[in-house]
Amino acid sequence: METTVRKQKKNLETKKPSIYSLQLHEMQDWLKEQGEPKFRAGQIFDWLYKKRVKNYEDMSNLSKGLREKLSNSFDITTLNTLVKQTSSDGTIKFLFQLYDGYSIETVLMRHEYGNSICVTTQVGCRIGCTFCASTLGGLKRNLEAGEIVAQVVEVQRALDESEERVSSLVVMGIGEPFDNYDNLMGFLRIINHEKGLHIGARHMTVSTSGIIPKIYKFAEEDLQINFAISLHAPNSELRSKLMPINRAYKLPDLMEAIKYYVNRTGRRITFEYGLFGGENDQVEHAEELAALLKGVKCHVNLIPVNYVPERDYVRTPREQIFLFEKTLKDRGVNVTIRREQGHDIDAACGQLRAKERKEETR
């Protein structure tokens, strides 16, 4: 009987590229190399993203020869579901296993306006935010575009049973999306394409901790995707304490990049601001934040933090959250408090994965 380690080693040795990593034009190029007509690419995408088949044999309008070529060239398997937690509010958290044994998290959130999914872009994270469970254990590797796509496909398959669909997505799961930029953009283009899952660009949001060169690059992309910055502090000193990335990419330089993005795209930016009891949640912090954002076309999303056992931060009291919000509103800042979801499951980013890793080491 094969051990888990031996199976993982075999998977690494025999791994083929994921078919879910291919954009339509890349599929067309591959078909041309195989002497096949390029219209077959649309048929293949239809099987993958509309019918969501799990094997090539089901692609009945393709020749046997083409199905064999696909099978020999590309892996069609997606992800193995290790854990599926369902909250009382309908939020579902998936722990998926990758081909090499690593695990990642994906979250389905239900809203009045539809179903939203939060996807992961890396196994672990190197950014080192002091409040985040995702950084525990460091960065293991980047996800391929197909592994990010597969998260959406798997969640959509789960929704197919109730004839629902994923209507929006946020790239705010484990990892720093801009630290895996090329695979991120490949994923977004596949998911957005009318032959893919066809999720509208304006229904997708990418969040970054502030990798400044990639913000300038993102401003030049042709997709009208919503953009969010994990800010969490109104000044450099406090931000460096909470987010070590601020030592490399200073807050004043970050704000310049953000202003360039807003002016270049004409789109509003969202600032994510987690509230940590006694750290960044006082009235003076709100006043300083309002001054920092003055003149910037933006929205502030206040996030009551989830408790992470491995971290020391505590939740801001409810009345203090409302006072912080009021202080911003009184100074003309567009602000909302994020609705909490999945409070009765391991909802904080990286929490379920960290719990699973801890159990594996016992």
From Swiss-Prot:
It comes from the Bacteria. It catalyses: adenosine(2503) in 23S rRNA + 2 reduced [2Fe-2S]-[ferredoxin] + 2 S-adenosyl-L-methionine = 2-methyladenosine(2503) in 23S rRNA + 5'-deoxyadenosine + L-methionine + 2 oxidized [2Fe-2S]-[ferredoxin] + S-adenosyl-L-homocysteine; adenosine(37) in tRNA + 2 reduced [2Fe-2S]-[ferredoxin] + 2 S-adenosyl-L-methionine = 2-methyladenosine(37) in tRNA + 5'-deoxyadenosine + L-methionine + 2 oxidized [2Fe-2S]-[ferredoxin] + S-adenosyl-L-homocysteine. The active site is at residues 105, 349. [4Fe-4S] cluster binds at residues 125, 129, 132. Its EC number is 2.1.1.192. Gene3D superfamilies: 1.10.150.530, Aldolase class I. The keyword Iron-sulfur applies. Disulfide bonds join 118-349. S-adenosyl-L-methionine binds at residues 175-176, 207, 230-232, 306. Binds 1 [4Fe-4S] cluster. The cluster is coordinated with 3 cysteines and an exchangeable S-adenosyl-L-methionine. It is found in: Cytoplasm. Residues 111-344 form the Radical SAM core domain. One of its GO terms (cellular component) is cytoplasm. Keywords: 4Fe-4S, Cytoplasm, Disulfide bond, Iron, Iron-sulfur, Metal-binding, Methyltransferase, rRNA processing, S-adenosyl-L-methionine, Transferase, tRNA processing. GO terms for molecular function: 4 iron, 4 sulfur cluster binding; metal ion binding; rRNA (adenine(2503)-C2-)-methyltransferase activity; rRNA binding; tRNA (adenine(37)-C2)-methyltransferase activity; tRNA binding. Specifically methylates position 2 of adenine 2503 in 23S rRNA and position 2 of adenine 37 in tRNAs. HAMAP family: RNA_methyltr_RlmN. Reaction proceeds by a ping-pong mechanism involving intermediate methylation of a conserved cysteine residue. Belongs to the radical SAM superfamily. RlmN family. This is Probable dual-specificity RNA methyltransferase RlmN. It comes from Bacillus anthracis.
